[in-house]
Amino acid sequence: MQGAQEASASEMLPLLLPLLWAGALAQERRFQLEGPESLTVQEGLCVLVPCRLPTTLPASYYGYGYWFLEGADVPVATNDPDEEVQEETRGRFHLLWDPRRKNCSLSIRDARRRDNAAYFFRLKSKWMKYGYTSSKLSVRVMALTHRPNISIPGTLESGHPSNLTCSVPWVCEQGTPPIFSWMSAAPTSLGPRTTQSSVLTITPRPQDHSTNLTCQVTFPGAGVTMERTIQLNVSYAPQKVAISIFQGNSAAFKILQNTSSLPVLEGQALRLLCDADGNPPAHLSWFQGFPALNATPISNTGVLELPQVGSAEEGDFTCRAQHPLGSLQISLSLFVHWKPEGRAGGVLGAVWGASITTLVFLCVCFIFRVKTRRKKAAQPVQNTDDVNPVMVSGSRGHQHQFQTGIVSDHPAEAGPISEDEQELHYAVLHFHKVQPQEPKVTDTEYSEIKIHK
């Protein structure tokens, strides 16, 4: 009889197990999660899935909490030390378990696109005949749209160091610290950093103006990288000043060296254009000559118009580039070439006139010298008795002594000469050496000697 009872019990056990399981399932109680039915988070960031234990749960209830991905048997987070969690969520999903405060929230950090799913919470106890299962909540993971912020205190000035800060204030502190990277052509050095910011010390140069500076932030927990690029606005004094020259309709050419020379034809139109670098732009002005600091410019712009170049424009012109951080200037020397029909023709005529005058003077001297020699060769020896000295006073106060002599070309027995008839005689003139005096009004004196017999 006893054996028959044992046999009947063993045969009925398979039939009783489904009933026992059904009773256990009947003891599973459900509760509603508080808050929205779905949450949105950007990849690389953090999100908190709120969960609150049911108020009907006895204070003496002790068990373990489990968060599950819908359709999965392995939890994504739990406080049960004997339970394994999914590899994909290990270290990123955490159960914030606090039975006293009824807290069963799920913390997700370093969110990834694969985390996009529905989740639910289950509460189980090994000593209780029933458990609790929450309603489902959907988590949507979107692409990261936030970008780093770059802040610059004040103005970047050439040669002066400044601290630039790259920050990501939207990053959660519980996540994996991001990696900051800086890219710039300017001289830089890294400063202090936190989980949400990085400081870069930069000493810009004039050539760094308008160049790019990039801050790149990588989130290693999610494998996402974001960056921001700005253009540097560097203040610097002028480094180069150049003059572009326009002569009439000819093409422009540029002068970069100081005190350069430029030949210009008289009457030609000239346009000088001054250009300088510097940031902010320098104030350009033109001066004639080499100006002092407080000199008055002839043009308050970078353009100097000379519509007709003449003698007044010959000389130096200076362009000055004034800047709060320093000034620079460049000078240009103009040399005026005169037109051939103008001054050049007059000079040529003067040369020809002087040449002709000299030639005529030499011819006169030559003729006078030849005549003088012929007269001396034809003059006979004179009798001293027939020489009569004649004194002539000049207007300059000098006395000249003249000796006259009768020279006969025929014998004495020639026919008599009338008293009234004038005879031609020769005179020998002796000029005493006169000391040179200042030139005065020229007087011409004539002497006529007549001898009557």
From Swiss-Prot:
Parts of the chain on the Cytoplasmic side = 369-453
Q: Which Cys-Cys disulfides exist here?
A: 46-172, 51-104, 166-215, 274-319
Q: Where is this motif: ITIM motif?
A: 424-429
Q: Which PROSITE patterns match?
A: IG_LIKE, IG_MHC
Classify the source by domain of life.
Answer: Eukaryota
Q: Which residues are glycosylated?
A: 103, 149, 163, 233
Which keywords label this protein? Cell adhesion, Cell membrane, Disulfide bond, Glycoprotein, Immunoglobulin domain, Lectin, Membrane, Repeat, Secreted, Signal, Transmembrane, Transmembrane helix
Example GO biological process term? cell adhesion
Name of one Pfam family that matches: V-set
One MF term in the entry's GO annotations: sialic acid binding
Q: Which residues form the Ig-like V-type domain?
A: 28-123
Residues assigned to the Extracellular compartment are: 27-347
GO CC terms in record:
cytosol; extracellular region; membrane; plasma membrane
Residue ranges annotated for the Ig-like C2-type domain, each copy included: 148-231, 238-333
Where N-acetylneuraminate is bound, by residue? 122
Q: In which tissues is it expressed?
A: Expressed at high levels in placenta (cyto- and syncytiotrophoblastic cells) and at lower levels in spleen, peripheral blood leukocytes (predominantly B-cells) and small intestine.
Place the motif SLAM-like motif on the sequence.
444-449
The signal peptide here is: 1-26
> Which spans of this chain does the record mark as coiled coil?
none
- Function, in words: Putative adhesion molecule that mediates sialic-acid dependent binding to cells. Binds to alpha-2,6-linked sialic acid. The sialic acid recognition site may be masked by cis interactions with sialic acids on the same cell surface.
* Assembly mode: Interacts with LEP.
Family from the record: Belongs to the immunoglobulin superfamily. SIGLEC (sialic acid binding Ig-like lectin) family.
Task: Report the domain remarks.
Answer: Contains 1 copy of a cytoplasmic motif that is referred to as the immunoreceptor tyrosine-based inhibitor motif (ITIM). This motif is involved in modulation of cellular responses. The phosphorylated ITIM motif can bind the SH2 domain of several SH2-containing phosphatases.
Q: Could you identify this protein by its name? A: Sialic acid-binding Ig-like lectin 6
User: Which source organism does the UniProt entry give?
Assistant: Homo sapiens
Identify the coding gene: SIGLEC6
